[in-house]
Amino acid sequence: MQDRQKAQDYRALLLADTPLIDVRAPIEFEQGAMPGAINLPLMMDDERAAVGTCYKRQGADAALALGHRLVCGDIRQQRLEAWKAAYQRFPNGYLCCARGGQRSHIVQRWLKETGIDCPLIEGGYKALRQTAIQATWQLAQKPILLIGGCTGSGKTQLVRQQPNGVDLEGLARHRGSSFGRTLNPQLSQASFENKLAVELLKINAHQTLKRWVLEDEGRTIGANHLPECLRERMAQAPIAVVEDPFALRLERLREEYFIRMHHDFTHAYGDEAGWQAYSEYLHHGLFAIRRRLGLQRFAELTDTLDRALAEQLSSGSTDGHMAWLVPLLNEYYDPMYRYQLEKKAANIVFRGTWQDVANWLKEQ
């Protein structure tokens, strides 16, 4: 194996966005994969399951023989062509299986028979995964500054503008609230953690890093939860709180949740299906917090939402949404965040408008 494939180079592979031809079964890939990996399995889920059962009952030799019988002829040729095409597309890529074992070696051998010498990852995905976990733990020990503030304060934008800012919500593909989902589905927990680790490694490699700047998040962002090592550090971190006028927050929320989300849904699905998806998205966000609102208040706000959607559909105006958004902020989101922030009052080091906080960050 070349030096670049040895254990001490795993971080370099991740930092370089090295393309990975991941030959694990789809179910394994879905449970966790590295950024930049493409899944071109040696065996599909049912084939892998059959080989696993055979291994338990009859041993390694019988399982290997079964694998070769399952992946032969046209099936073998089709998969081989896919690996060849992937290598031609990514000539600096690597083969990767679970542990750098038989699957990646078999694919490597088959490719070599066609004249392609494709390297593989020693230790496989599990070695890269351990590297990602260790990197997150190590880099989370650096000082952290949190950006706090009520919904609509522009916290994410502020974080993105910092050279040492890490957009946790962007990595999670979710904006944190019940209305936070995007058109891109969230990654599995392991894939989210891997993506976060690579982002930390990249920023650390390219910045003179005094500290991380992160948004003040809870334990979870949608379906993804923050690594405990990072969460523990965030719980003790100083906080700069954005306190913008309510009207300005409303305009940010109008742009983000009504104008942009409507545009994104219709762009992705067309006018009719996109409108339906947009409507369902807003209804789902409200439905998700119905118990906290109380069923009567939930029903009232749902009626108001329906009227606002009808107005938006007929005239294009999003003004009607303010009739349910304003009480939702006043009665639910703002009191909830202020309660959470009060428990961390000792950690607050600065308060001011969005621009005040932006200027303060430049001076630090």
Swiss-Prot record:
Q: Which Gene3D superfamilies match?
A: Rhodanese-like domain
What catalytic activity is recorded?
A: 5-methylaminomethyl-2-thiouridine(34) in tRNA + selenophosphate + (2E)-geranyl diphosphate + H2O + H(+) = 5-methylaminomethyl-2-selenouridine(34) in tRNA + (2E)-thiogeraniol + phosphate + diphosphate; 5-methylaminomethyl-2-thiouridine(34) in tRNA + (2E)-geranyl diphosphate = 5-methylaminomethyl-S-(2E)-geranyl-thiouridine(34) in tRNA + diphosphate; 5-methylaminomethyl-S-(2E)-geranyl-thiouridine(34) in tRNA + selenophosphate + H(+) = 5-methylaminomethyl-2-(Se-phospho)selenouridine(34) in tRNA + (2E)-thiogeraniol; 5-methylaminomethyl-2-(Se-phospho)selenouridine(34) in tRNA + H2O = 5-methylaminomethyl-2-selenouridine(34) in tRNA + phosphate
Alphabetically list the UniProt keywords. Selenium, Transferase
Q: Which InterPro entries match?
A: Rhodanese-like_dom (IPR001763), Rhodanese-like_dom_sf (IPR036873), SelU (IPR017582)
Question: Which PROSITE patterns does the protein's record reference?
Answer: RHODANESE_3 (PS50206)
Rhodanese domain sequence ranges: 14-137
What SMART domains has UniProt attached to this entry? RHOD
The catalytic activity of this protein is classed by the Enzyme Commission as 2.9.1.3
Active site at 97 (s-selanylcysteine intermediate)
Superkingdom is Bacteria
Q: Name one GO biological process term.
A: tRNA wobble uridine modification
Tell me one GO molecular function of this protein: tRNA 2-selenouridine synthase activity
Cite the CDD domains for this sequence: RHOD_YbbB
Give the NCBIfam families listed for this entry.
PRK11784.1-1, PRK11784.1-3, tRNA_sel_U_synt
Matching HAMAP family: tRNA_sel_U_synth
Q: Tell me the function of this protein.
A: Involved in the post-transcriptional modification of the uridine at the wobble position (U34) of tRNA(Lys), tRNA(Glu) and tRNA(Gln). Catalyzes the conversion of 2-thiouridine (S2U-RNA) to 2-selenouridine (Se2U-RNA). Acts in a two-step process involving geranylation of 2-thiouridine (S2U) to S-geranyl-2-thiouridine (geS2U) and subsequent selenation of the latter derivative to 2-selenouridine (Se2U) in the tRNA chain.
Question: Quaternary structure?
Answer: Monomer.
Name the family.
Belongs to the SelU family.
User: Could you identify this protein by its name?
Assistant: tRNA 2-selenouridine synthase
- Phylogenetic placement of the source organism: Bacteria, Pseudomonadati, Pseudomonadota, Gammaproteobacteria, Enterobacterales
